[in-house]
């Protein structure tokens, strides 16, 4: 384990962001562990330190704009934009569709980094990428605090503060469901 990995894990535990239990993820899968990065993001100094790990990985990437899908990517986009001297905006859902609102625009040819707090399946950042590309922007990387993908979920280069292997299950194969353990649904995908 790298020193930065230990620092990130220790910080996530310290703020109560790494949870144990039975969780219904926004992807629809179930897990016995959950990373609630909102618990990290409520502490600006700790978030700054954890996001510096991924900001350092972006130093040699040529990009113009940071875009974070609401909800999890908004503060991450702001903080990475602040650390790297880039403007930051966000996409959000309107009537269930990811879109740009609030006067935000992406110029044709702008190079964009998409941010997230946690990436599991990549659904949110893929929706944001579609919006960016429809506006004429070019996605050059995806970054997150926690990468918990089971493998390659994107053709875009992906950078993270930490890679965590957290097992997840389809609902019909979930051992916690079979044991009758009730789940909680901590994600934000259903925000309209």
Swiss-Prot record:
Transmembrane segments: none annotated. Pathway: Pyrimidine metabolism; UMP biosynthesis via de novo pathway; UMP from orotate: step 1/2. 5-phospho-alpha-D-ribose 1-diphosphate binds at residues 116-124. The keyword Cytoplasm does not apply. Orotate binds at residues 120, 148. It comes from the Bacteria. InterPro entries: OPRT, Orotate_PRibTrfase_bac, PRibTrfase_dom, PRTase-like. Homodimer. This is Orotate phosphoribosyltransferase. The lineage of its organism: Bacteria, Bacillati, Bacillota, Clostridia, Eubacteriales. The gene is pyrE.
